[in-house]
Amino acid sequence: MAILKERTFRYSYSKEMVFNSVDTIAFPMISFCDLPLSEFSEYIGKYGGYSIGVSRSWGIKIGVNPVWYCDFYSNVVHSIMKLLLRELNSSDYGYVYELFEILAYIKPMEDKLKTKRVGYSKYRFSDERELRIVPYLRDLESKSVKPFLYNKLYEEYKVSNNNSSLIELGESFEWSDIKYVIVKNKTDVKRVRKLLKTFNCDNEDIGIFYQQQVKADFIGIEHNKVDMPTLSSTDLSHIQNLITQLQNINPINWQNNIINHENN
């Protein structure tokens, strides 16, 4: 609950595979899913124990952008890679920072995903509709923050930072910017309400829900458990007669039609 206590989303290094032929690169970022609660069931609890819903106007104010989902082998990614290599070979590194700004918003449409709870061999990231904000990389050096970390340096940073990828920079918010909080269990709801009071929260309209409640009440996770009516032999016979009547109304020799289609 540090985010609520500090009223700040802190940037953290997040590893991204921007090119299929190089190691991962970790950029400092803050990420959100642009999904309504009705489409949130697949992602509840996937990246952490609780979720915070913020207003779209707050996101626009701080400058979030949709992630650019690309295929590793697309012409776009290949062109960016060629430009980056050219700039890295120049005497003054030219537009290297600007190109890395673009790379920081690129994410594969599908790739492997491993979280603390579960792993996927082929996860479709584009379904998350991720919004992301990355600080201006060129300005980070003056704040003693590395603009990006390659794989080994990223692991070393986490070891030196108590296994955390967070940095000191962040984006603050007002209580009025928070729409809801989703906690893990029903017992956590009262605890979070008390915490908000101790944090001097003055927004009484913040909804606090627990994960199973959201899945069952808002999304309808129980719909698959509804018993479907069983058809009797009489019902089946009646349906078969209707099909026969429809075929007679539109007499088409289906077998010949299929054969002709295959021959063509």
Residue ranges and their predicted role:
Residues 1-264:
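NAD-dependent ADP-ribosyltransferases
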